[in-house]
Structure formats: structure tokens, C-alpha cells
Amino acid sequence: MRTDYCGLIDKKYLGQTVTVKGWAHRRRDHGGVIFIDLRDREGLVQVVIDPDTPEAFKLADSSRGEYVLSITGIVRERPAGTANSKMISGEIEILAKEIEILNAAATPPFQIDDENLSENVRLTNRVIDLRRPAMQKNLRLRYKVAMGVRNHLDKQGFIDIETPMLTRSTPEGARDYLVPSRVHPGEFFALPQSPQLFKQLLMVAGFDRYYQITKCFRDEDLRADRQPEFTQIDIETSFLNEDEIMDITEGMTKEIFQDVLGVTLPTFPRMTYGDAMFYYGSDKPDMRVALKFTELTDVMKSEEFKVFRGAADMANGRVVALRVPNGASFSRKEIDDYTQFVAIYGAKGLAYIKVNDVTKLNEEGLQSPIVKFLSANGLKEIIARTGAQNGDIIFFGADKAKVVNEAIGALRIKIGHEHGLENGYFVKEWRPLWVVDFPMFEHDEEEDRWTACHHPFTSPKPGHEDLMATDPGKCLARAYDMVLNGWEIGGGSIRIHRADIQEKVFGALKISPEEQQNKFGFLLDNLKFGAPPHGGLAFGLDRLVTLMCGAESIRDVIAFPKTQRAQCLLTNAPNAVDDKQLRELNLRLRQKAEPSA
């Protein structure tokens, strides 16, 4: 029987006979004495095997990396000068008396401590990859976060209730994963994009406080913070307003950071969506970066410079400046690199002014190809509004507001992370905030219709109900997002609890009464049976843990993730199925799967 984990054997076991089990992490032969570092989920312990125990020595000699071993021996102090203070077991070693090889191992595709691996190699050999201490640490932290959520919500009176994984397809922004029904030919289930409607119905049913940690599915293009299946911490409450819901979830987040990381988070400030877009070009601003936009659209309406004037006169145009302290030292190559970077977001160029002498608002004091095209008053306004000092650089964005916000917003983050620490406009701290007062709708220019910013079940702010019909663009929602270091880790809203208001929202979205009844009849019908005011919030567990681990991708905090092409390299999923299975489901393929390489 195992005495304890390898990584937990310490001086309290001195002189005792212990049994440890794990993997041979490293084997060394030093002058006739064999050393094996035995590894399990808690870490390593050093085992010494000398020739005085011939049977154990023989088995140790035949062992190789990743062999699974059971070792019994006596715990003793390491010789002077060989202790490792970074390990719990670093002051002791085990003098082996018995060794049992529980299983041999083929040579692994890479060394467990190899850090220079491509992601494809790691994901193809995910089981071996998961043996690496970094991955063990990440998944242990994920477990602690999930337990922290459960413990906190349990204390707050929330009930864990499961909702269906097979449900009907309803539009929620992304494509559904569809599951054909064998029993009902020609009909399909959908895997849930979220438990949204079911959790609202649980509030109508009177459960008052619900939560679950559940899988959700979205068939969308993937990025570093996206997976086709992801884990959501889903929360819903009755009879609470947005302030009360934000207080509960903020308290939960603070408690988790304190318990798991030993970090005390500050009170979460609140920022309107309008301010977030105005100053940072993003609804999830990274507040570690102190750089802000300076609005210049009004100034440029009076200028002759076509690039700026054209954007300023555009219906949805915007002109902003981004002042970077000490940025005048940026090289031509750096500026060219930034120009290429903003082009990713649709920017056609990146104008700039290097400020050499603020007392000379001309080409002598301001270094830039665009200075000669701007009036003295325009230059004066730029310097005054940005607060530029000698040695600064000012970058400009001029285009449709969407392009400017995305391009200059991304540039703000990039420069902040690359140069902010040494120049005082970046802090290595946790900077959470709430973003509130989101628009209820956004206009889809391609389809020329209004769409829901969050989802169509979000309640409008009191007094904004009539705007849904008269001026949807000015209608604000009772929605709120929790943002941490530039990542949206949670989003929620107060829901619509009256059927007549829900029907008005559907009407604003051009969903006909027939379509409303077909897709959402079960919701509308039940809202009429005395639905309480209710609201909630959903956290992305994967994103939250990624931030807490300092990982580069959510794939580093998920045991068996998909690639950016929505494939599992370990199991080669998705895969083609045989014709018999298709016939049973009454399906015929229009396009056959390509043969595997």
C-alpha cells in the first residue's frame, strides 16, 4: 500500500519505511549506485539503489524512463550539500529495499521536461503531455477554482441543477452543433450554446437560485480563447437586481482568487460601455495599460487633410489619437511593424507625429510627414488634447469607427505590453472591472437589420422600452460584463420576465409572431404563468483558469482540447461514419469526407 505521494515525502518520515509508486522521471548511474527520480502528481522524490540490495539493484538497472514502479525503502537525509530547498522532498531520499516494475514503457515521443514542443506534437500525444508538471498544475488549479465556485454558491443558497444536453435549435449568434434524431426522421436536436432558456424556466418554476458548471457548444471560428466545446459557470437568480447579482459574483471571484492564488483583488470599478469604447476602443479594456484614446473627430471636420477629414465626415467615422510617452524613440522599423499590425484589423495606414519640441507646432518641433497637411489650430488641438510632452509619439486612427476601435485598441495593448513597464504606463497587477450599460441592439449593415448585442432575452433599461420601436440604437440593456486584464470572463443581464416585453424585443429583431411561437413558444407560454424578475451571469471557466494560470491559450487548461480547426488530434475526431449509421439516421452525404493521410 502506498504510504504517501512522492512529492509529499519529507523529513517527518525520517527513519521510516515507506512505499511510493509512480513513474521513473529520470535514472542516473553514479559509480555503481543508481538514482531514480520517481514522479507522481505531487512531484518528485529521489530514490537511491545500491548493490547491497541485489534484486532491487537489478530491477533498477533494467528500468527506463516512464517505467511504472513501486518502491519500498527507508527515508534518510540527503548528504550535506545535496538538498534541494525548492522541493518538499528535497531534504530527504529513499534508500530502496524493494522495487517492483508495475509496467514497462515504450520510449515516449518527447521528454516530460521538454518545454520546446509544438502544440500539434503536444495535442497528438496529449496523454504524455498531461504528465508534464505544468499541465498537472494547471488542471489541479482548475479543479480548485471549480470547487471554490461550488463552495461559495452553496453558502449563498444556490442549487446545482442539470439542464438538457439535447435540446432544440434556437438562434443565439453562433451556429449550432446538430444531432440527427433516429426516432424522428428528418428532425434534429442541437447541443446547447448555453443553458439560457432552461435556467430562465427554472426561475419561473420557483427555484430562486440556480447554478451549474456545464459544457456548452458553439460551431464557430476558433481563436486562442475559443473552443467548440467549453465549460461555463452558469448562474441565475430571482428577485435580485443587477447590483445585487454583481455583488454576489464579484464576491465569489474575490474569494476564489484569495483561496487559490493568495491574491486580494481590489473592488471592481464600473465603466459604461460608452466610456470603454470612447477611451479604449474595446468593451473589455485591459486596465493594466494606462494609454487612452483622445477624440479628434470634431477637430478634423475643419481640417483639409483628406485622410482625417474624410473619416470625420463619414457617417460612422472616427478620428482618434493615441499618445505614447517616450515613444519618439521608436525606430522606423518599429513604426513600420506597427503599421503592418494595425492592417490586420483593416486600417489602411498608421499616421504618427513624433513630438520633439511642443513649443514649436510646425515641422521643426513636430516630426511627421502629415504635419504640413494640418493647420496650426489643428496641431494645437492635438497637442493640447493629448497632453503630449517632448519625447512622445502620437499615433492616429481615421476610418470607420469599428476599424479605428479595433485597430488602435489592439495597438494600445501591443505597445502597452511591449514598452509600458519601463515607461510607466503598464502595471503587472490584476485589474478587474465591470462594464455596464451596453446597447440593447447593434445594426447589421450587411443584412440591414438590428441584432441583439447580448441575446434577445436581455431586458431593456427602465424607460427604454419604447426606444425598441422608435430608435433601437439608443436603447440600453440591463447587461453587465466582468472584465479582467483585457479578457471578458463573465457576462450577464437582467432577463425579460414579461411575455409582452419579450414579444416587443422579438419584433424589434424582425422575428415574426409565427417564428416567435415556433422557436420560443415554450418560453413565451411559461412567462405568462407568473414569471418572477430574474437575472444572472455566466463565467467562462476555461478563460478564468487560463488567466489565473498565466497560460497562453485555453488549450493549456483543458485536459483534451480541440485544435483551432476543431479537431482532436489524440482521437482523430471528427471522423467519417459508415453507411449503415447514416441509413439509420436517414442521412445522405452531399460531400464525402476526404480520406485520412
Curated annotation (Swiss-Prot):
Q: What EC number(s) does this enzyme carry?
A: 6.1.1.23
Task: Determine if ATP-binding is one of this entry's keywords.
Answer: yes
A GO CC annotation recorded here is:
cytoplasm
Q: Give GO terms for biological process.
A: aspartyl-tRNA aminoacylation
Ranges in coiled-coil conformation: none
* UniProt binding sites for ATP: R218, D219, E220, Q227, E488, G540, L541, D542, R543
Q: Which InterPro entries match?
A: Aa-tRNA-synt_II (IPR004364), aa-tRNA-synth_II (IPR006195), aa-tRNA-synth_II/BPL/LPL (IPR045864), Asp-tRNA-ligase_1 (IPR004524), Asp-tRNA-ligase_1_N (IPR047089), Asp/Asn-tRNA-synth_IIb (IPR002312), AspRS_core (IPR047090), GAD-like_sf (IPR004115)
Chain residues that bind L-aspartate? E172, R218, H454, R495
Q: Which SUPFAM superfamilies match?
A: Class II aaRS and biotin synthetases, GAD domain-like, Nucleic acid-binding proteins
Q: Care to name a GO molecular-function term for this sequence?
A: ATP binding
Q: Where in the cell is it found?
A: Cytoplasm
Answer whether the UniProt record assigns the keyword DNA-binding to this protein. Answer: no
This protein's UniProt keywords = Aminoacyl-tRNA synthetase, ATP-binding, Cytoplasm, Ligase, Nucleotide-binding, Protein biosynthesis
So what does this thing catalyse? tRNA(Asx) + L-aspartate + ATP = L-aspartyl-tRNA(Asx) + AMP + diphosphate
State the CDD domains in the record: AspRS_core (cd00777), EcAspRS_like_N (cd04317)
Residues covered by region (Aspartate)? 196-199
Q: Name one Pfam family in it.
A: tRNA-synt_2
NCBIfam families per UniProt = aspS_bact (TIGR00459), PRK00476.1 (NF001750)
Q: Subunit structure of this entry?
A: Homodimer.
PANTHER family found in the cross-reference section: ASPARTATE--TRNA LIGASE, MITOCHONDRIAL (PTHR22594:SF5), ASPARTYL/LYSYL-TRNA SYNTHETASE (PTHR22594)
Query: What is the recorded function of this protein according to its Swiss-Prot or TrEMBL entry?
Result: Aspartyl-tRNA synthetase with relaxed tRNA specificity since it is able to aspartylate not only its cognate tRNA(Asp) but also tRNA(Asn). Reaction proceeds in two steps: L-aspartate is first activated by ATP to form Asp-AMP and then transferred to the acceptor end of tRNA(Asp/Asn).
> What name goes with this protein?
Aspartate--tRNA(Asp/Asn) ligase
